[in-house]
Amino acid sequence: MKLNISELKCQQHDKLVTIYCCACDAYFCKKCDKEKHSQDDNQEDSLHIRGLVNKDVIIGRDEEDDDDEDDEYDNKIQDILKKSNNLKKSNSIGGNIVENIELKSPMKTDSPYFIRDKNSIQSDIDSKITEKIDLDNLIHEEDDPFTIGINSNNSNSNNLIDVNDLHTPSTPSPLPSPSLSRSSSTNIKPQQQTSPSPSRSSESNSTTNNNNNKNEKKKLKNSSNSELNRKKIYKKEKIIGDSDEEEHILNNGNKNKNNKSKSVYDYDDDDDNDDDNNNNNNNNNNNNNNNNNENDDNSNSKSEGGVFYSSSSETEKEIENVENKIDNKPKPPNKSLPKTPQSNKKKKPENSIMVKNLDSGLVEQIFEEEEEEEEDEDEVGSESGGGGTIFKNPYSNRKNKSGKYKSNSCALEEGEEDDSSIQSQFDGEEKEAVHIVQGIVEGAILFGTNIATGLSGIVAEPIINIVDNQDNKVKGFFKGVGKGLLGAVTSPVKGGSGFLIKTAEGLRNTPATVFHGDHEDLMGFSDADQVKEREASHIFEGIAQGTISLSKNLYLGVTGIVTEPIKGLREDENNKAKGFFKGVGKGLMGAIVKPASGIIEMAGKTAEGIANTPHTIINAIEMKIDEKSNNNNNNNNLDSDSEGETYVNPNEN
């Protein structure tokens, strides 16, 4: 038997219907579903529960299957179509199936997938349920509870035709529907079930089961004063659908649920006895407690297949149960604080009692404020010469060679270095000029800067000293005037010395730049990486530094004639001749340039010492005055303390 695919096409768009809506009781193609259930157009229709049509039922089996399997499959489809007709013709259900049907997911009742369709709930409490439904947790493809069959007699009004058993303790025991009789044309055995369900059996049992169903219906009508609310309970069936259609319907679903289910049409040969026993138990009208126990067993079993109708006493009680289960949904745990990589900042306490009682956002804010304060403290200012340079505190990165943090203890750990060696690298930030042009340019800039500093000090120094000496502003003013005039005289001298020193540096490093570019001298240090020597504080220190520089440059200039060619041979092993001639050129050029550089640097260092001598003398005098004043204050404090005390002779007693 083959179904006519043309009967399954949408008349409006001429496309295959792939979606079924329980609330609308209709089939839709992808475009129709977008128009009907768009969240922007109609908020209520967007809450309708919809499922993908079972493509295995629509398309049919492959032609390569055996004849026995084809016959079995044809019988299944015929049985499906009969059930569809019975559902449609049943007067107890009505034209719209969903109005009297409660839809449930195969998940547990406390699962976020436990959801009701909006049209199946009373209008006065509709909003309470829909507000608590998490729209981000829609039913996923694997959790889709719908199985759709096709009515070949009427292609325009297809109905939901097959469901599975799932009963919760909150619902009474399910009873077989009078509209769903056993099919007389099928020999398919149903899968084993622990609760009463309509099954496919042989022709000899079909008539007795129909009579039992009719008797059961009469008993239910006589026992209830109000009309029974018939509900259809669905359980999951694996749905086969296109990926784009799944995205359209289930775009907000959780796609990582690994729940597997067997097909509705997986039957075992040994299930006849169990199914007959279950039907007999149902026909004998067991008490409600036994029925509830059977419902519990059904909810945990994996048996699938069959259609059930359950009668409920009051709809409001079940709605309250749904609300409670939605409210009791477990909340996800709070996110822990993110781990921060190792840095020079304080580590966050992991097991602190104080942190446990604080909110995670507040804790993160506290740590961020502490880190910002530490970053501000790491920025340190140091004055060198006339201007000041800002550089990163070398002690902020207290790491040893292995990458670990250094401790604050006095003893040096393994792999650590003395802090004095680190600090010495930052006493001066200026690097030597690598050639003569750079030396002249930097020297000219330094000369102009010192002149500007000296002239501005005439005005700035009196103001600064008045602010610093609030107790005696007159004294501070004249002190500032003296410093300003002294700076105006010494700053140009200091600028001239800086120009000479920079020029000497560039001249000394020119040969290395021209021939090699690596700026390495005999000691193995890079001239460009050498830190500038500290300034001479007085004239004698300037003369001493200048003499040392002159002697060093004379020595390097003379010995370089021999040592530079040897170095060229060692460095350039691939082309020793090239290295040799480079060394010869570097040595000859250094023999002329380096002594000249030493003479210029000696003059510059001497001028630097002369310029700094007045400041050194003034600072020494101020320090002596401060020391005397501090000593006098200490003596006065001791005298005042001694006057308040009385001497007691211990021998007087």
UniProtKB/Swiss-Prot annotation:
A zinc finger (B box-type) spans 5-49. CDD domains: Bbox2_MYCBP2 (cd19799). GO terms for molecular function: zinc ion binding. Coiled coil: none annotated. It is a peripheral membrane protein. GO terms for cellular component: membrane. Residues 159-232, 248-420, 627-653 are annotated as: Disordered. Mediates the transfer of lipids between membranes at organelle contact sites. This is Intermembrane lipid transfer protein vps13l. It comes from Dictyostelium discoideum (Social amoeba). The lineage of its organism: Eukaryota, Amoebozoa, Evosea, Eumycetozoa, Dictyostelia.
